[in-house]
Curated annotation (Swiss-Prot):
The PTS EIIA type-3 domain is phosphorylated by phospho-HPr on a histidyl residue. Then, it transfers the phosphoryl group to the PTS EIIB type-3 domain. Binds 1 Mg(2+) ion per trimer. Keywords: Cytoplasm, Magnesium, Metal-binding, Phosphoprotein, Phosphotransferase system, Sugar transport, Transferase, Transport. GO terms for molecular function: metal ion binding; transferase activity. This is PTS system lactose-specific EIIA component. Induction: Induced by lactose, galactose and galactose-6-P. Repressed by glucose. The active site is at 80 (tele-phosphohistidine intermediate). Residues 6-104 form the PTS EIIA type-3 domain. Homotrimer. Gene3D superfamilies: Phosphotransferase system, lactose/cellobiose-type IIA subunit (1.20.58.80).
Length: 112
């Protein structure tokens, strides 16, 4: 069985959409953390994680099909989707780290 280019492209579009939403939430989480609103930052990074999980689920479906022997034609939108997924996963990891950094900086500033 072969996944059609259209099916692969649709998964690519889904990856871009979910990962794009996740990226937006992660950037807003950084903004909230910088402003000292750590509850909002954590809420937004969790939303980013949920969105990236949806993107990852889309990716996993195609990977499972390919592992099962389905032939895949790579489309440019799929490459873009994969790129967006991976860079956003990294951004979410870094956002979690930076929220902790901003919180620590705020704690140190409050000690002065």
């Amino acid at each position: 069985m072969m996944a059609t280019k259209e099916e692969i492209s649709m998964v690519g579009f889904a990856l871009v959409a979910y990962a794009g939403d996740a990226r937006t939430a992660a950037v807003h989480a950084l903004d909230a953390a910088e402003a000292g609103d750590f509850d909002k930052a954590n809420e937004l990074v969790e939303k980013a994680q949920q969105d990236i999980n949806e993107a990852h689920n889309q990716q996993t479906q195609l990977l499972s099909q390919e592992a099962g022997g389905a032939e895949m034609d790579v489309t440019f939108i799929m490459v873009h989707g994969q790129d967006t997924l991976m860079t956003t996963m990294l951004l979410i990891d870094e956002t979690r780290y930076m929220i902790r950094m901003f919180k620590r900086i705020k704690e140190l500033e409050n000690k002065q």
